[in-house]
């Protein structure tokens, strides 16, 4: 049995995550009381013919605070039964969550006469602290639309070709914010920028003219060799520590040229030693 626990602040995309998982064969349960997690695991062991082999449940701030505080011990009970269990935590910045609630006009579950929407959003993070601390995969949905979030969920949760740590190399542009869910961040803004070459500006790091330009720059090659040497040495150590997911972010100014080029090269260079490796370009249209 595979169990995915989906959590996150309201408006971060939990419903979308459950829909994606359901569309891909998971039996989904929304707003499961956290205290029922061990019972769900026990039933899975005793009645394997009755329960679906892939189950996803959402646990969020609608739970009793006392149950949320017990999440670490409840999770340990589940994993002690040797069930493959991943904890997914979705989030977005406060401003984005406020905007989403304003646009949909939905009521936040924690708002009341004495608590404003902004206060509810802040308080929700405190309530979910125990889940945040034990999340295997965190996804920041601030800059993701509905379709991008669906693609990201499929990429990270459903496309693991074999057991072990799932690695993601992600290019991004600092002008749209640094990905808060990254485990390692490399800033490559010091490298020559193709954007300032008029004939290269409209291309990306996936296009041959930009590839040829950057491949000819000594500083770019040196940066690639240094990052590759670091990742080649240390990523296997992450895998050996039983990490389920590791995200490596490569950032330039706009996320179109230098970071894309280096992410692609690193993906190719590390594909053989790291079987579960994927490359994504956050800011390419």
UniProtKB/Swiss-Prot annotation:
Pfam families: PapZ_C, RapZ-like_N. Keywords: ATP-binding, GTP-binding, Nucleotide-binding. GO terms for molecular function: ATP binding; GTP binding. It comes from the Bacteria. The keyword Acetylation does not apply. Coiled coil: none annotated. HAMAP family: RapZ_like (MF_00636). This is Nucleotide-binding protein PST_1028. It comes from Stutzerimonas stutzeri (strain A1501).
């Amino acid at each position: 049995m595979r169990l995915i626990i989906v959590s996150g602040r309201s408006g971060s995309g939990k419903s979308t995550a459950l829909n994606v998982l359901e569309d891909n064969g998971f039996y989904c349960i929304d707003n499961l009381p956290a205290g029922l997690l061990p019972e769900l695991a026990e039933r899975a062991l005793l009645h394997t013919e009755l329960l679906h082999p892939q189950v996803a449940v959402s646990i969020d701030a609608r739970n009793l605070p006392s149950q949320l505080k017990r999440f670490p011990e409840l999770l340990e009970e589940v994993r002690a039964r040797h069930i493959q269990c991943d904890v997914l935590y979705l989030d977005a910045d406060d401003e984005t969550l406020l905007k989403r609630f304003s646009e949909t006009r939905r009521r936040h579950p924690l708002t009341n006469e004495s608590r404003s929407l902004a206060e509810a959003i802040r308080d929700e993070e405190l309530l979910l602290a125990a889940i945040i601390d034990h999340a295997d995969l965190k996804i920041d949905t601030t800059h993701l639309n509905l379709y991008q979030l669906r693609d990201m969920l499929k990429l990270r949760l459903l496309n693991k070709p074999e057991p072990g740590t799932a690695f993601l190399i992600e290019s991004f542009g600092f002008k749209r914010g640094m990905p808060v869910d990254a485990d390692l961040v490399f800033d490559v803004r010091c490298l020559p920028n193709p954007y300032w070459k008029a004939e290269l500006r409209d291309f990306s790091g996936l296009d041959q003219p930009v590839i040829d330009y950057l491949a000819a720059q000594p500083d770019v090659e040196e940066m690639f060799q240094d990052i590759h040497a670091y990742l080649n040495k240390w990523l296997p150590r992450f895998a050996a520590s039983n990490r389920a997911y590791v995200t490596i972010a490569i950032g330039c100014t706009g996320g179109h040229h230098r970071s894309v080029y280096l992410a692609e090269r690193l993906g190719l260079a590390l594909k053989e030693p790291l079987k579960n490796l994927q490359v994504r370009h956050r800011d390419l249209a």
